[in-house]
């Protein structure tokens, strides 16, 4: 959570009505986000400076591992994710039908996603699928559930938005079971602080880096496809 003092209290109160162990990562907020979370009695990880999405996920993974949690649901604090969807992504993990459950915005197309975001997400997801052999619809969804095996065996390293792809690449290499569940994401205005072009480019570069490390044979077959997709991304952005 980064500067979410206006929404964090309501979110935590609603979550505490259904769930016991709640972790909030205060990612260098300059407002009262961290103080509010602490007063409401949840587990708070405090970053002295903003480390970004990847830094927050890394810290949450480590804390969940330390607490020996059986499952971890990652959930945005900006109001885009619906609390009622948590049980949907948690169910396959509880029933041992998957190691990772991803909440997808595209399986039922009920999320009113801004056009530029949809194009960017689908481009990055396409690159991820080509480079890993996965067949998923939303590689960039942050609404996920991980089981204990994932928490114990995967050590994310990316500090940026590329961490979502990194986890998928490492999971595929380990032959972990990945499933997607349809969810609805609420877009009221544009809550993102990321420049879409910078974000897209950074995720693509992260994907190339992790594919070259984890799947070197695949890496040399996708540069042309990546450059082609980047061209499409920039072309659409200028329309």
What is each residue range found by the language model?
Residues 2-17:
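Short, well-formed alpha-helical segments that are part of the catalytic scaffolds
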Residues 133, 157-239:
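Hydrophobic helical membrane-anchoring modules
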Residues 14-23, 32, 40-42:
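Short loop->beta transition adjacent to catalytic acidic/histidine clusters or analogous donor-positioning motifs
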Residues 43, 47-66, 71, 83-161, ...:
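Acceptor/aglycone-binding surface of glycosyltransferases and processive sugar-polymer synthases
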Residues 26-34, 79:
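A conserved acidic beta->alpha catalytic loop
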Residues 1, 25-27, 47:
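Conserved sequence signature across two-component system core domains
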Residues 6-10, 31-40:
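Acidic helix N-cap motif at the loop->helix transition within catalytic regions
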